[in-house]
Curated annotation (Swiss-Prot):
It holds the Pfam family Lir1. Its main location: plastid. It is a peripheral membrane protein. This is Light-regulated protein, chloroplastic. GO terms for biological process: cellular response to light stimulus; circadian rhythm. May form interchain disulfide bonds with LFNR1 and LFNR2. Residues 58-125 are annotated as: 2 X 15 AA approximate repeats. Component of high molecular weight thylakoid LFNRs-containing protein complexes containing LIR1, LFNR1, LFNR2, TIC62 and TROL proteins. Interacts directly with LFNR1 and LFNR2; LIR1 increases the affinity of LFNR1 and LFNR2 for TIC62 and subsequent thylakoid relocalization. It is found in: Plastid, Chloroplast thylakoid membrane; Plastid, Chloroplast envelope; Plastid, Chloroplast stroma.
Length: 128
């Protein structure tokens, strides 16, 4: 197989030599055509995009269980669940009222004084 491959490229491993007074003749390399089955030459190409629209979970631990191989080469942690006391604290924080000052935007030329001073300078800085 190696000599066939080298002749396809056009390289010859052995050059003819002069034998018993004959002159040295260099022959042109022979080209041998090899037929390769298309199925054997095909290379598997992975898609550059991943479709996440399936009903199957893509969590690493489950992927490792289902697929194995490279899917198991990630750092995995056990599933974390919030305790009931943490869930109550989160809901309390969300319900907490915050006192805010709102500006009225009903005028056609509402301007923030600090931003006007920073952007425009001059007479706009006197208003602050």
């Amino acid at each position: 197989m190696q000599t066939a491959a080298s002749s396809v490229v056009g390289l010859s491993a052995v050059l003819p030599a002069a034998v018993k007074g004959r002159s040295l003749q260099i022959q042109a390399p022979r080209r041998v055509a090899l037929r390769v089955r298309a199925a054997a030459a095909a290379v598997a190409v992975e898609a550059a995009e991943v479709d996440y629209s399936s009903n199957i979970s893509v969590f690493p631990m489950e992927a490792c269980d289902l697929i194995g191989g490279e899917a198991c080469n990630v750092q995995m942690y056990p599933e974390a669940k919030l305790s009931s006391s943490a869930a109550v604290a989160v809901s309390r924080a969300a319900a907490e009222e915050v006192d805010r000052d709102y500006l009225s935007y009903d005028e056609p030329t509402t301007v923030f004084p600090e931003e006007a001073c920073d952007d425009l300078g001059g007479e706009f800085c006197k208003a602050t």
